[in-house]
A protein has these predicted regions:
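Short beta-strand-centered segment that lines the nucleotide-binding/catalytic pocket of NTP-utilizing
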Residues: 12-32
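Flexible beta-alpha connector loops of hexameric P-loop NTPases
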Residues: 13-15, 59-68, 92-98, 135-136
């Protein structure tokens, strides 16, 4: 999910796999924006570029990473260098409690370096396209309810700060422009 998202945002050539921990070291890409704020595609070489944003795809953080489980400290050191963080959470039907992933990420970041969670700019609910589809037991109403519950959970987790939740599909590029605009607006503050 994260590597696919990096490819959508920056056209980077990150390895994508259908198994956990495909990414073992950071991958980098550059988002490019035009004068009107739209994100350039790789083909937009002749247009006037106004802003760039470097994006890093980090290896997944697991429970007890802050205690150096796995390659925890090595991965967390990379995250520490980032000025803004986006949590990419599996929001598909096989993950009934996506908010638990947010809690784990917050706990690991905060235990590793207090204040690191203040850099979280948004939560991307990835695989949102899988909810309410024709070959899916979820109905559209179930999907809306799951998203509403998730947004409420995220609000409580980050309170008093507001961290937006944007449902996306990196694979199908659903809401990628919306996410890019939000990140760009955070960089110009």
């Amino acid at each position: 999910g994260k590597s696919t998202l990096l490819r959508c945002l920056s056209r980077a050539d990150a390895e994508v796999g259908s198994y956990s921990f495909t990414t073992l070291s950071p991958n980098f890409g550059v988002m490019r924006f035009g004068p009107d704020g739209h994100m350039f595609s790789q083909d937009d070489r002749n247009e006037h570029e106004m802003q760039r944003l470097t994006v890093a795809d980090m290896p997944g953080i697991i429970k007890d990473a802050s205690k150096n489980k796995g390659l925890g400290h090595e991965f967390l050191r990379h995250i520490e260098r980032c000025s803004m963080l986006v949590y990419v959470i599996d929001f598909g039907p096989t993950n009934p409690r996506p908010s638990s992933e947010v809690l784990i990420l917050n706990r690991e970041l905060e235990q590793y370096r207090p204040g690191l969670i203040d850099r979280v700019a948004l939560v991307a609910a990835n695989k949102a396209d899988l909810l309410g589809g024709t070959h899916n037991p979820y109905t559209e109403e179930d999907a809306r309810e799951k998203l509403l519950r998730f947004r409420q959970d995220v609000d409580m987790i980050f309170e008093p700060r507001s961290v937006p939740v944007i449902p996306i599909s990196a694979k199908h590029q659903l809401n990628i422009d919306r996410m890019a605009k939000h990140l760009q607006s955070r960089c110009t503050l």
